[in-house]
Amino acid sequence: MATLLRSLALFKRNKDKPPITSGSGGAIRGIKHIIIVPIPGDSSITTRSRLLDRLVRLIGNPDVSGPKLTGALIGILSLFVESPGQLIQRITDDPDVSIRLLEVVQSDQSQSGLTFASRGTNMEDEADQYFSHDDPISSDQSRFGWFENKEISDIEVQDPEGFNMILGTILAQIWVLLAKAVTAPDTAADSELRRWIKYTQQRRVVGEFRLERKWLDVVRNIIAEDLSLRRFMVALILDIKRTPGNKPRIAEMICDIDTYIVEAGLASFILTIKFGIETMYPALGLHEFAGELSTLESLMNLYQQMGKPAPYMVNLENSIQNKFSAGSYPLLWSYAMGVGVELENSMGGLNFGRSYFDPAYFRLGQEMVRRSAGKVSSTLASELGITAEDARLVSEIAMHTTEDKISRAVGPRQAQVSFLQGDQSENELPRLGGKEDRRVKQSRGEARESYRETGPSRASDARAAHLPTGTPLDIDTASESSQDPQDSRRSAEPLLRLQAMAGISEEQGSDTDTPTVYNDRNLLD
């Protein structure tokens, strides 16, 4: 048996290992397409600011698409460094594209004010054609979808400080788009606006240079579609992180935005570790979790073996990302989500509508948190030097805090309906007093009579018909238990029926001598 277990552990490790690049096989290269990236040909701030202005207009032009957009974005992303050409050549290793650098200098003979650097050849016409200045109609279109402040006609400046502020403002808006361009583009606008407000308050960006929504939508779409652009952005982030010493202000801002980009698309894996394993609840000892715990251990080792690009595997479209999906450990993931919605309010808005979601283990996680409230881990207490008296004090305080949280209905709405608790007893009903209290007592008596005459099903309807409207009923998450036949009386359908019956009985008034009993068929009619 010991040999079998060792073989199993070795099999799991080898199964999840990334492929090793060895053997006599040659490198597989795809059919490359050429991307032209304009870069400044001198160190003049005027050249850089004019190039930035022309590239922003070029991206806003609806007639421009494909590799030309990608080259323009790479040119903007590399403008903050002293030598953009060296940076691009150093970090670019893409098997799908071939990047051609095109140096740009000032020119008084072209409509765009720029020309391509060449030896003895006039390239003004080619520069105007590239920057879409050869057609007046196209030039007008390039201004559409630019800045929200229409009073800004251009962003050409001559001092380095002003240029860095404008460039940093534009780069911040571009980098924020990478956070959800691939994983959640439909809900990205709200989070992008929060990031913009944050950096505006920190004076990292200038509010007047807020780009229009249409311009941002174009950039978000090209980021989502173009893998080569995302590879360049991830390579640039990793290169900035490797830079020793103090970094430029724009580089520090990019690292700050990276906290929203890193581990995008890996929420299931990260949250399962956080709430399923790190909480160290005794439920981890279940036999059902043994295999998935071994799988998760192998995935954590694989994550470390992948190195620095591991947190960006979804943005890089790495095929190994499928191993980290929640479908590889569905029971442990469902349990971790139940723990999460009880511990953190932010987890209440997560969507659990997956085919492999198991409501039984979700409720296990919820109940594990509720019943373990106020308990102190003996192992952790011994490591921290906590005495038994201190542990009792902490447990007492934690229990009062938990009760206060439940009484104020604080937390995610998933936590307000228990799937494992029984029905509320008569002594636990809220005291209403006066006429309403008498009505509740009357309904209880009628319910007992109805139980003796018609059986438990009709009696339950009689009790529901006179439930006071002040009783809180939360049905937002009751649908999660509808898949379990044993919990059908606590599912969304009975709760909806109770609420509807309470409304009907309230309309009849308090002077009714013989209250009417409504069943399911009455409500459906």
UniProtKB/Swiss-Prot annotation:
It comes from Measles virus (strain Edmonston). RNA binds at residues 180, 195, 202, 260, 351. Its main location: virion. Keywords: Capsid protein, Helical capsid protein, Host cytoplasm, Host nucleus, Host-virus interaction, Phosphoprotein, Ribonucleoprotein, RNA-binding, Viral nucleoprotein, Virion. Forms the helical nucleocapsid (NC) in a ratio of 1 N per 6 ribonucleotides, protecting the genome from nucleases. The nucleocapsid (NC) has a helical structure with either 12.35 or 11.64 N per turn, approximately 20 nm in diameter, with a hollow central cavity approximately 5 nm in diameter. The encapsidated genomic RNA serves as template for transcription and replication; encapsidation by N is coupled to RNA synthesis. Forms the encapsidation complex with the phosphoprotein protein P. Before encapsidation, the newly synthesized free N protein, so-called N0, is chaperoned by P. The keyword Phosphoprotein applies. Residues 477-505 are annotated as: Interaction with the phosphoprotein. The lineage of its organism: Viruses, Riboviria, Orthornavirae, Negarnaviricota, Haploviricotina. Residues 1-375 are annotated as: RNA packaging and organization of the helical nucleocapsid. Belongs to the paramyxoviruses nucleocapsid family. This is Nucleoprotein. Ncore is globular and carries regions required for N self-assembly and RNA-binding. Ntail is an intrinsically disordered monomeric domain in the C-terminus. It holds the Pfam family Paramyxo_ncap. Homomultimer; forms the nucleocapsid. Binds to viral genomic RNA. N0 interacts (via Ncore) with the phosphoprotein (via N-terminus); this interaction allows P to chaperon N0 to avoid N polymerization and non-specific RNA binding before encapsidation. Interacts as N-RNA template (via the Ntail) with the phosphoprotein (via C-terminus XD); this interaction maintains the P/L complex anchored to the nucleocapsid template during the sequential transcription. Residues 433-452 have a biased composition (Basic and acidic residues). It is found in: Virion; Host cytoplasm; Host nucleus. Residues 418-525 are annotated as: Disordered. The modification Phosphothreonine is found at residue 279. Phosphorylation at Thr-279 is required for the formation of the nucleocapsid. One of its GO terms (cellular component) is host cell cytoplasm. A motif (Nuclear export signal) lies at residues 425-440. Residues 1-36, 373-391 are annotated as: Homomultimerization. Residues 404-525 are annotated as: Ntail.
